[in-house]
Amino acid sequence: MFPYVTLAKDKSWQPGPYDGVELLVLHKNETTGGVTILRKFREGLTVPAHIHPLANEYAYVLSGEWEESGAVYTTGAFFFAPKGVKHGPHHAKTEVISLTVFDGPLTVQ
């Protein structure tokens, strides 16, 4: 049996770092501060360009469609943003849900 199991249906969505972004924490590594989360972006939301100074970001789009720098990402897209590298702005063309892993504390600048 796995040492840690959780069900998303047993968790609650929490406010994210921007209005219109919600987070559902599936797991937090108490040693590194890293998190595995579901992220929900409200349709029409634009998240400004930003960096994550303390963590690499790995994201897989579960549903929805968003645009960044003229590229459109849809269900099945995977992307990686290295720690400290500016990315965005992101525009949610529809509601977007992603499975995202930050390998260190989730901070935004």
Which residues does each PLM region occupy?
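Catalytic core of non-heme Fe(II) oxygenases with the double-stranded beta-helix
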Residues: 18-27, 34-36, 43-49, 57
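Ligand-binding loop in jelly-roll beta-barrel domains
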Residues: 21, 55, 73, 83-108
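Glyoxalase I/VOC metalloenzyme domain signal
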Residues: 7-10, 43, 105
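A short, N-terminal "cap"/entry segment at the start of jelly-roll beta-barrel domains
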Residues: 1-33
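Glycine- and acidic-residue-biased ligand/ion/polar-headgroup-sensing regions
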Residues: 43, 52-68, 75
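Histidine-centered metal-chelating micro-motifs
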Residues: 46-48, 67, 79, 83-88
